[in-house]
Amino acid sequence: MRQAFAAVPLALSFVLAGCSTELGPSRAELQAQWDAQNVYPQNYKADLLAFLRTYLNNPQGVRGAMVSPPALTTVGQGQRYVACLRYNARDIDGKYMGQKEGAAIYVSARLDRFADQPHEVKQLCSGAAYAAFPELEALRR
């Protein structure tokens, strides 16, 4: 019986020692993983066109389409490649809805998320250098 009580502190020390070890990746490892996903999206226009074909209610006859080349921008805890977009698309009834803006956020050179909330887009796209995007204006269903 006395030996059983002597073994309890030893077992308890092993259990507590297991709690003090770090189970997940370190902060530096997480940052390295995040940075490794920053690959320039060579096909950003094709990705945007494929996405907008389904995102827009009426992708035909878009006017005033402009896009910025992807640039590293602060998103969340680090930087991501972001391409900014301006366009005037039609609604289901064929009426133009007015100029809209969006930001395409890329992870590992692929479109990960499209931000369309004005406050977020304004923050992500401040200082973006836009150029004409005739491929979007020529888009069909």
Mark where each language-model region is.
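Bacterial N-terminal signal peptides that target proteins for export
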Residues: 1-8
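Structured alpha-helical
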Residues: 12
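C-terminal motif of bacterial Sec signal peptides marking the signal peptidase cleavage site
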Residues: 15-18
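Cystatin/cathelin-like cysteine-protease inhibitor module
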Residues: 20-141
